Amino acid sequence: MEGERPRSDTVTTTVSSHMETISLGGSIAYDRSFLRSPTGVLLLMEIMFGLLVWALIAGSEYFLFSAFGWVMFVAVFYWVLSVFFFLLHLTRANTRITKVPWSLVGLCFNGSAFVLYLIAAVVEASSVNKDVHQHHNYNSWTASSFFAFIVTVCYALSTYFSFQAWRTKS
Protein backbone atom coordinates (compact mmCIF):
# COMPACT_ATOMS: atom_id res chain seq x y z
CA MET A 1 0.00 0.00 0.00
CA GLU A 2 2.96 2.25 0.28
CA GLY A 3 3.36 2.91 -3.46
CA GLU A 4 -0.32 3.51 -4.21
CA ARG A 5 -1.66 6.90 -4.99
CA PRO A 6 -4.68 8.18 -3.09
CA ARG A 7 -7.90 7.39 -4.88
CA SER A 8 -9.92 10.31 -6.19
CA ASP A 9 -13.51 10.08 -7.28
CA THR A 10 -14.40 11.88 -10.46
CA VAL A 11 -17.94 13.11 -10.85
CA THR A 12 -19.17 14.03 -14.28
CA THR A 13 -22.30 16.13 -14.57
CA THR A 14 -24.13 16.62 -17.82
CA VAL A 15 -26.84 19.13 -18.42
CA SER A 16 -29.13 18.76 -21.35
CA SER A 17 -31.74 21.09 -22.62
CA HIS A 18 -34.52 20.23 -24.96
CA MET A 19 -34.73 22.53 -27.96
CA GLU A 20 -37.88 22.12 -29.91
CA THR A 21 -37.12 22.91 -33.52
CA ILE A 22 -39.02 22.35 -36.68
CA SER A 23 -37.16 22.10 -39.94
CA LEU A 24 -38.72 24.01 -42.81
CA GLY A 25 -36.47 22.56 -45.43
CA GLY A 26 -32.79 22.25 -46.17
CA SER A 27 -31.00 24.37 -43.60
CA ILE A 28 -33.74 26.62 -42.29
CA ALA A 29 -35.31 25.69 -38.97
CA TYR A 30 -37.10 27.65 -36.29
CA ASP A 31 -37.12 27.35 -32.56
CA ARG A 32 -40.60 27.08 -31.07
CA SER A 33 -39.34 27.46 -27.53
CA PHE A 34 -37.98 30.92 -28.41
CA LEU A 35 -41.51 32.07 -29.24
CA ARG A 36 -42.58 31.13 -25.70
CA SER A 37 -39.59 32.70 -23.96
CA PRO A 38 -39.76 36.19 -22.40
CA THR A 39 -37.26 37.44 -24.98
CA GLY A 40 -39.33 36.08 -27.86
CA VAL A 41 -42.61 37.45 -26.52
CA LEU A 42 -41.08 40.87 -25.90
CA LEU A 43 -39.54 40.98 -29.39
CA LEU A 44 -42.94 40.12 -30.89
CA MET A 45 -44.58 42.88 -28.85
CA GLU A 46 -41.86 45.36 -29.88
CA ILE A 47 -42.44 44.46 -33.53
CA MET A 48 -46.25 44.69 -33.34
CA PHE A 49 -46.48 47.88 -31.29
CA GLY A 50 -43.52 49.46 -33.10
CA LEU A 51 -45.31 48.85 -36.39
CA LEU A 52 -48.37 50.62 -34.98
CA VAL A 53 -46.22 53.58 -33.90
CA TRP A 54 -44.72 54.27 -37.30
CA ALA A 55 -47.83 53.30 -39.30
CA LEU A 56 -49.97 55.77 -37.35
CA ILE A 57 -47.41 58.52 -37.88
CA ALA A 58 -46.85 57.66 -41.55
CA GLY A 59 -50.60 57.98 -42.19
CA SER A 60 -50.52 61.63 -41.10
CA GLU A 61 -48.75 64.78 -42.19
CA TYR A 62 -45.76 64.12 -39.94
CA PHE A 63 -43.29 65.67 -42.39
CA LEU A 64 -44.59 69.15 -41.52
CA PHE A 65 -43.25 68.83 -37.96
CA SER A 66 -39.65 67.89 -37.25
CA ALA A 67 -40.50 66.27 -33.92
CA PHE A 68 -42.58 63.63 -35.69
CA GLY A 69 -39.78 63.06 -38.19
CA TRP A 70 -37.53 62.13 -35.27
CA VAL A 71 -40.15 59.78 -33.84
CA MET A 72 -40.61 58.22 -37.27
CA PHE A 73 -36.84 57.67 -37.61
CA VAL A 74 -36.56 55.99 -34.20
CA ALA A 75 -39.67 53.85 -34.77
CA VAL A 76 -38.68 52.59 -38.23
CA PHE A 77 -35.00 52.10 -37.35
CA TYR A 78 -35.69 49.98 -34.27
CA TRP A 79 -38.58 48.16 -35.94
CA VAL A 80 -36.27 46.97 -38.73
CA LEU A 81 -33.58 45.95 -36.23
CA SER A 82 -36.15 44.17 -34.05
CA VAL A 83 -37.37 42.16 -37.04
CA PHE A 84 -33.74 41.28 -37.83
CA PHE A 85 -33.00 40.14 -34.26
CA PHE A 86 -36.29 38.24 -34.09
CA LEU A 87 -35.46 36.28 -37.24
CA LEU A 88 -31.89 35.78 -36.05
CA HIS A 89 -33.05 34.24 -32.76
CA LEU A 90 -36.00 32.37 -34.27
CA THR A 91 -33.76 30.54 -36.73
CA ARG A 92 -31.00 30.19 -34.10
CA ALA A 93 -28.56 31.75 -36.56
CA ASN A 94 -26.95 33.56 -33.63
CA THR A 95 -25.71 30.20 -32.30
CA ARG A 96 -23.91 29.54 -35.57
CA ILE A 97 -22.08 32.88 -35.50
CA THR A 98 -19.90 32.32 -32.46
CA LYS A 99 -17.46 35.22 -32.84
CA VAL A 100 -20.12 37.82 -31.99
CA PRO A 101 -20.81 38.45 -28.27
CA TRP A 102 -24.59 38.22 -28.68
CA SER A 103 -25.42 38.95 -25.05
CA LEU A 104 -23.50 42.24 -25.25
CA VAL A 105 -25.01 43.06 -28.65
CA GLY A 106 -28.50 42.43 -27.23
CA LEU A 107 -27.78 44.61 -24.21
CA CYS A 108 -26.51 47.50 -26.36
CA PHE A 109 -29.41 47.16 -28.80
CA ASN A 110 -32.13 47.01 -26.15
CA GLY A 111 -30.52 49.69 -23.98
CA SER A 112 -30.20 52.14 -26.86
CA ALA A 113 -33.72 51.32 -28.06
CA PHE A 114 -35.10 51.98 -24.58
CA VAL A 115 -33.36 55.36 -24.26
CA LEU A 116 -34.17 56.60 -27.77
CA TYR A 117 -37.75 55.31 -27.69
CA LEU A 118 -38.29 57.01 -24.32
CA ILE A 119 -37.03 60.30 -25.76
CA ALA A 120 -39.16 59.83 -28.90
CA ALA A 121 -42.28 58.99 -26.88
CA VAL A 122 -41.87 62.05 -24.66
CA VAL A 123 -41.19 64.29 -27.68
CA GLU A 124 -44.23 62.91 -29.47
CA ALA A 125 -46.53 63.22 -26.46
CA SER A 126 -45.44 66.81 -25.87
CA SER A 127 -45.90 67.70 -29.56
CA VAL A 128 -49.52 66.58 -29.78
CA ASN A 129 -51.75 69.65 -29.59
CA LYS A 130 -55.45 69.35 -30.44
CA ASP A 131 -55.96 73.07 -31.09
CA VAL A 132 -53.19 73.43 -33.67
CA HIS A 133 -53.40 70.18 -35.63
CA GLN A 134 -56.17 68.62 -37.67
CA HIS A 135 -58.47 66.16 -35.94
CA HIS A 136 -57.20 63.14 -37.91
CA ASN A 137 -53.57 63.93 -37.14
CA TYR A 138 -54.41 64.46 -33.47
CA ASN A 139 -56.03 61.02 -33.15
CA SER A 140 -53.20 59.28 -35.01
CA TRP A 141 -50.48 61.03 -33.05
CA THR A 142 -52.20 60.44 -29.72
CA ALA A 143 -52.57 56.72 -30.44
CA SER A 144 -49.01 56.56 -31.74
CA SER A 145 -47.75 58.26 -28.59
CA PHE A 146 -49.59 55.71 -26.43
CA PHE A 147 -48.07 52.80 -28.36
CA ALA A 148 -44.63 54.44 -28.23
CA PHE A 149 -44.76 54.32 -24.44
CA ILE A 150 -45.82 50.65 -24.58
CA VAL A 151 -42.85 49.87 -26.85
CA THR A 152 -40.61 51.79 -24.45
CA VAL A 153 -41.73 49.54 -21.59
CA CYS A 154 -41.11 46.46 -23.76
CA TYR A 155 -37.58 47.63 -24.55
CA ALA A 156 -36.98 48.39 -20.85
CA LEU A 157 -37.94 44.82 -19.96
CA SER A 158 -35.80 43.48 -22.81
CA THR A 159 -32.89 45.55 -21.50
CA TYR A 160 -33.33 43.95 -18.08
CA PHE A 161 -33.34 40.42 -19.53
CA SER A 162 -30.38 41.27 -21.77
CA PHE A 163 -28.47 42.58 -18.77
CA GLN A 164 -29.17 39.37 -16.86
CA ALA A 165 -27.96 37.27 -19.82
CA TRP A 166 -24.85 39.42 -20.24
CA ARG A 167 -24.02 39.29 -16.53
CA THR A 168 -24.27 35.50 -16.39
CA LYS A 169 -22.02 35.12 -19.46
CA SER A 170 -19.37 37.59 -18.25
Curated annotation (Swiss-Prot):
Keywords: Membrane, Nucleus, Transmembrane, Transmembrane helix. It is found in: Membrane; Nucleus. Pfam families: MARVEL. Residues 34-167 form the MARVEL domain. GO terms for biological process: myelination. The keyword Membrane applies. The chain crosses the membrane at residues 39-59, 68-88, 103-123, 146-166. Residues 1-38, 89-102, 167-170 are cytoplasmic. One of its GO terms (molecular function) is structural constituent of myelin sheath. It is a multi-pass membrane protein. This is MARVEL domain-containing protein 1. The gene is marveld1.
